[in-house]
């Protein structure tokens, strides 16, 4: 691939054309569509009720990335989940739309196929301090084979986050990612 800014935008149609050198050792930001239904368990936790979108991503995009890199890459995953809203007392976000529930299920599915090749790093926060979630990647602490889940991307819409904050987050994400793959419209 050409080493231009435009070459960092990889769509599904172009993924098949990539070579190992395009992705090996790189940090890949993947915008996924993991907006999946959740169900409440008897213990008050939530579980993925239908993992079709997650499995489709693993069977297509993730499989191709693994074939090209054999785990020698760093992956940052961003997705939204539902439409989170503030708690009635405005103390924080309703935890129902915590991407952690998706992250746990994703980890289970990845381990079944790839064993310990990949290490999943869940989001640290339920709230909208999303820039903090990029620190592990920005400071090169995400190891090869590391997959970092960002908090629910809809948290960026928190009214306390200014447009400047959102731009800073996007700029920081662009600085750490070598490649962008958009799978959010599958």
State where each predicted segment sits.
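Active-site loop-to-helix "anion-binding N-cap" substructures in soluble metabolic enzymes
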Residues: 1-186
């Amino acid at each position: 691939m050409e080493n231009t800014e435009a070459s960092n935008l990889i769509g599904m149609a172009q993924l098949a054309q990539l070579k190992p050198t395009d992705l090996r050792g790189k940090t890949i930001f993947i915008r996924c569509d993991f907006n999946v239904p959740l169900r409440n368990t008897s213990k008050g936790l939530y579980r993925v009720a239908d993992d079709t979108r997650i499995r489709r991503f693993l069977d297509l995009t993730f499989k191709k990335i693994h074939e090209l890199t054999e785990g020698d890459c760093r992956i940052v995953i961003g997705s939204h989940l539902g439409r989170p809203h503030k708690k009635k007392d405005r103390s924080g976000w309703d935890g129902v739309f915590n991407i952690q529930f998706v992250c746990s299920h994703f980890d289970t599915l990845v381990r079944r196929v790839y064993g310990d090749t990949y290490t999943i790093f869940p989001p640290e926060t339920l709230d909208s301090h999303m820039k903090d979630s990029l620190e592990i990647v920005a400071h090169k602490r995400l190891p090869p084979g590391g997959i970092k889940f960002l908090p629910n991307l809809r948290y960026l819409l928190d009214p306390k986050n200014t447009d400047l904050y959102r731009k800073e987050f996007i700029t920081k994400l662009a600085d750490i990612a070598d490649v962008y793959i958009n799978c959010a419209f599958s």
